[in-house]
Amino acid sequence: MSRGYPENNNFLNNNNQMVLDMILYPLIGIPQTINWETVARLVPGLTPKECVKRFDELKSCGSSPVDNQYNPLMATGEGPVETLATYIKSSLLDTQGDFQETPVDQDTVSKAGRHSIATTRNCSSESENCTARNAGEETGESEGPNMVIHVCDEAKSLKEDFICPRDLLISEMKYFAEYLSMDAQRWEEVDISVHCDVHIFNWLIKYVKRNTKESKDCEIPALEPGNVISILISSEFLKMDSLVEQCIQYCHKNMNAIVAAPCNMNCINANLLTRIADLFTHNEIDDLKDKKDKFRSKLFCKKIERLFDPEYSNPDSRNNAATLYRCCLCKKLLTRETERRIPCIPGKINVDRHGNIIYIHIRDKTWDVHEYLNSLFEELKSWRDVYWRLWGTVNWLTCSRCYQAFLCIEFSHCQYHSEVVVYSSTVNSLNTVGTGIYPCCNQKVLRFDPTQLTKGCKVRDHMVVLHDQGENDDSPSCPPAKILDDLHKHKDVIAVPFLKDAVSDPGVGSCDEKGLEYEILLEPNTPWGSKTGELNAFLSLKNWTLQLKQQSLFSEEEEYTTGSEVTEDEVGDEEEIAKKQRKKEKPKKFTKPPKKQLSSPCSQKKEKTLEKSTSRDVSPFVVSMQKNKWDASRSLRFNQDAQREDDQRRMSEITGHLIKMRLGDLDRVKAKESKEFAGGIYSRLEAQVRASVPVTARQNSSDKNQRSKSRFGQGRPA
């Protein structure tokens, strides 16, 4: 050991280095090229660069430094040594001469890494011997060079090295494909370090080598409830697609055992959670026995997200919530599919060209779906209940009793009367042949009701007969039978109690005639009927359709006019025409009304409806001529100026409307504020500041402003 190599004492203490010296010593003096890749495979843990370096040291020395120390081991006979030398010369020499020694400039393998390889191999000798034997003999040329992976387990303070052929590592763990280049000169420059649980990575390496020859001696690993989550996360990071799919399928089949095992499921990312949730039906998630709620709420949250995905074909729901909104009239939550089936208030009923009744809902712009979900969670305290309530909101069925489509949340809202309607056979002062009375609540009803709205004083559960419904073609993946079954299973969460709302259900529980005024039922003081309340059904229906036409035209005028033009409802009345003529005769200057008054059609609508209630049926329905028409009695310049002003006004209105469409929060802010400010938020803040200032201070400031204005007016030349 004292032949001029004191720095190599530690180097020779390792058995691997002693084996390397025994392999390299017979190669000294041979002129043929040495295949250093094959030499490195014989000694696990060493690179071709280290073998070249050690070979140069042995050539400069002239003799092996292990002769004296290991001569007793070789003194038994010359046969093994000669056999080893013969094998080395035959297998390690490159007879073709194609491979040349490549100089390596960078030292990429640290000494700490080599020390870790040696120590961990001593701890797990059985598995490493199996790996080293197969890596050196069987995987030689077919699977590429062996790659050493340093695994650091900080939680257990363990370090271990694993060896795997490069080609097999790239094909199974695609994460390393971008780091392990196909260039042979860079194979020895790569140092792989993985921070992972040692046992989990050992499981992964065994899975990678499951189809190799060495797997015959090693046991093929199996998934367990205690390790499947860790393996799933690690395999997803290493891009082991086949193993990820196996883990997801295992989680679907054994979720009850997994949630009962002591494992952390918070590390599952959104992508894996979505793939797992897609395998579950909502009934399977509901049946999970998750006492600590480690995973069930997350699955229900993913199901809620899927309900809002318009491109996802949901096997649990026939409709999605992507177009969910609230009607500002009937206050019902509707989608694009349910809005044409669920009735609104009687004033928004229309008839299509085929004679079918259609419902027109108006979207409530102040309603926000995120606030709705948060309020549902605050009310129900569980994402499971939130999902079932939302599922019942977007799905519908048809009742075989009332023949009306209903939302699943309104399952217990089937209105009916406990007694049969009684129609009078004789005409008297209180009734006509076309009307009847329910004795249970004294509610009056038409014999032929064109609205086809269900009305009753009591409610019960809807009855659904599946063979009577023609809805099986709407969603083949989720038939009505499945929806009805899910509705019965979770009725306590889905169904909401019935509320006697005067807007949506005015006929329920009301015994007076005011609750029945739908513009189609009884109106006691109608001008065309008798004073005692006699009703003509045909005239009532005619009046109702005329009113709908007027309302539609009125709504269009509200939306596209500023209020300065003459409305169509004011022309048919002779009193209004006389008033306008008197106004024209008065020598008053024309002043344009402010926009603040023009932008409040609600008050105008109330006043106009009061005026129309007494005169809408006396005079015919006439559409008025607008003021912005060309006036032949005026001069050309006047008409051109008027047209230019009208175009400017119209463009300003279009600009304002586009701004409101772009800033959708404007309507929400206006709805929350009791007072509107034309100047926007700055005007509102100024009003708040002025309201907070004492009255005396405001009076003093106003006096000062008036004095300053008067002085400024005096100093200005006339």
Swiss-Prot record:
<feature type="region of interest" description="Disordered">
    <location>
        <begin position="690"/>
        <end position="718"/>
    </location>
</feature>
<feature type="region of interest" description="Disordered">
    <location>
        <begin position="555"/>
        <end position="622"/>
    </location>
</feature>
<feature type="compositionally biased region" description="Basic and acidic residues">
    <location>
        <begin position="604"/>
        <end position="615"/>
    </location>
</feature>
<dbReference type="Pfam" id="PF11822">
    <property type="entry name" value="BTB_SANBR"/>
</dbReference>
<feature type="compositionally biased region" description="Basic residues">
    <location>
        <begin position="580"/>
        <end position="595"/>
    </location>
</feature>
<dbReference type="GO" id="GO:0042802">
    <property type="term" value="F:identical protein binding"/>
</dbReference>
<protein>
    <recommendedName>
        <fullName>SANT and BTB domain regulator of class switch recombination</fullName>
    </recommendedName>
</protein>
<feature type="domain" description="SANT">
    <location>
        <begin position="21"/>
        <end position="59"/>
    </location>
</feature>
<dbReference type="GO" id="GO:0045190">
    <property type="term" value="P:isotype switching"/>
</dbReference>
<comment type="subunit">
    <text>Homodimer. Interacts (via the BTB domain) with HDAC1 and NCOR2.</text>
</comment>
<dbReference type="InterPro" id="IPR021777">
    <property type="entry name" value="SANBR_BTB"/>
</dbReference>
<comment type="similarity">
    <text>Belongs to the KIAA1841 family.</text>
</comment>
<comment type="function">
    <text>Negatively regulates class switch recombination or isotype switching in splenic B-cells.</text>
</comment>
<feature type="compositionally biased region" description="Acidic residues">
    <location>
        <begin position="555"/>
        <end position="576"/>
    </location>
</feature>
<dbReference type="InterPro" id="IPR045902">
    <property type="entry name" value="SANBR-like"/>
</dbReference>
<feature type="domain" description="BTB">
    <location>
        <begin position="147"/>
        <end position="255"/>
    </location>
</feature>
<dbReference type="InterPro" id="IPR011333">
    <property type="entry name" value="SKP1/BTB/POZ_sf"/>
</dbReference>
<dbReference type="InterPro" id="IPR001005">
    <property type="entry name" value="SANT/Myb"/>
</dbReference>
